[in-house]
Amino acid sequence: MSSVVIVGSQWGDEGKGKMTDYLSQEADVVVRSQGGNNAGHTIAFDGKKFALRLVPSGIFAKDKLAVIGNGVVINPPALLKELHYLQDNGIDISGLRISSRSHITFPYHILLDKCQEEAKGDHKVGTTKNGIGPTYMDKVSRVGIRMCDLLEKDTFKEKLERNLAEKNELFTKLYHVDPISFDDIFESYYEYGQELKQYVTDTAQIVNDALDQDKKVLFEGAQGVMLDVDQGTYPYVTASNPIAGGVCTGVGVGPNKIETVVGICKAYSTRVGAGPFPTELTDEIGDQIRETGHEYGTVTGRPRRVGWFDSVAMRHARRVSGISCLSLNLLDVLTGLKTVKICTSYKLDGKQIDYYPASLKELERCEPVYEELPGWDEDITGAKKFEDLPINAQNYLKRVSELSESPLATVSVGADRIQTIIVKDPWEFAHK
């Protein structure tokens, strides 16, 4: 058995897709376990850039299975749009597998998401308004419609009628918007299900069988640890569990099947939307990093908030997600800065702390304590091994690793797959 879990160790957008694409070359199965079409990932493949939201990045690897696990919430028209887009670009999608237990996002989830966000006024969470939270809300309320229900016309009809009756009460009486018609959803979504039916199966069995047969399984995360509904900056979080533990529930594998957890991070920090962000840069350095790193959301297009690398948040991510090693991206973006900073701890009400507070009010009062290191001007985009990097870049990476309490596995110095320095292949950590 050999398994690797990829988790975003910051606030999402860390470049998980690139590492998934790289590691999937050796994997037999690539699995996604949570999130929905709120999570965008961009992959450079064969000279083209592909922006995906639902389809696992492993779809680009030939002769592999790309699995959407039960923890993923699926918007059928959005998924079909992606599949057609891939086919139009010559990508073979025959390896796709979709869990029959995955939950479905409907138009009423999207409308409810928008209504709830607007009702929050100045306290908006900053959701993508794709209906992800309301879909998970129905799931835990035990009224959700799953993929297996969508394929059974009578079951789908019964559940849709019941859900719409409840949701339309909310729309008309609480939010004062027009109700959603049953006829606008039923036939079209049933047809979506029929088109997806060929890919629907018991994915937990597929993944467990692969592990039991000593095949390599790669679990692809979405979002990031700091957006985890339990361990992140609640309530400014996503509705699912991006931590490594979410793989177990979101795929249907036991924790003893998880061998290695790769924490994906940037050489700096970013987040989209509202919420605490202790190392945020609002000056010209932040603007420079944003423009050089093209820091705009894959899904929303919103400019990302930018900050220095936060080792306090990283250590929190390591603890709650069991990170084995780090895969650091976008080191090249820091090229040209005279100095680079790493947050080593916080000051809370004058007292130095090295933990990440749960309280939002405490986080707002936290001041980052920085360690400053000299920067570098040399072009690093062609570096093939660690020793090719300027000494100042090497020292920066070593300090990030030390403060994060995690060894470096890879360093990315450019967008292309080949622009990756392998310090130690993450698959090797599975056999330590």
Curated annotation (Swiss-Prot):
Mg(2+) binds at D13, G40. Binds 1 Mg(2+) ion per subunit. GO terms for cellular component: cytoplasm. IMP binds at D13, E14, G15, K16, N38, A39, G40, H41, T128, R142, Q223, T238, R302. Keywords: Cytoplasm, GTP-binding, Ligase, Magnesium, Metal-binding, Nucleotide-binding, Purine biosynthesis. Pfam families: Adenylsucc_synt (PF00709). Signal peptide: none annotated. GTP binds at residues 12-18, 40-42, 304, 330-332, 412-414. Substrate binds at T298, V299, T300, G301, R302, P303, R304. Belongs to the adenylosuccinate synthetase family. This is Adenylosuccinate synthetase. The lineage of its organism: Bacteria, Bacillati, Bacillota, Bacilli, Lactobacillales.
